[in-house]
C-alpha cells in the first residue's frame, strides 16, 4: 500500500444557474470522471479517494453552463487502467468528447 494517508475528497456543491452561458462550442479541456469503485477499481498508489463524479453528473453541469465539447483527463487514482476514461468517452460520444490517457513508460507502438 502507501506510506501516506489517503485523503478523502469533499463532494461538490450544488450547480447554480449562471448569469450567462458559455459561448457556442465551448470546450472544457481538463476534467476527470470518477466512476463507481465497484466498476473502476482505485489504484493502491492513489493519493486520495474521490467522490463519485460520473458522466450524468458532469453532463448536468455542462448543460447548465453551456459546455458542448470536452477533453477528459485520466485520473491518477486509476493508474494506467484507462477503462473509466474510455467508457466515459463512449458514453459522451466521440462527436463531443476526447481523452488523455496514461500508459506505462514501456508501452510499445503496437500496444497503442
Question: Where are the predicted features?
Answer:
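Helix-coil boundary/capping segments in enzymes
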Residues: 1-112
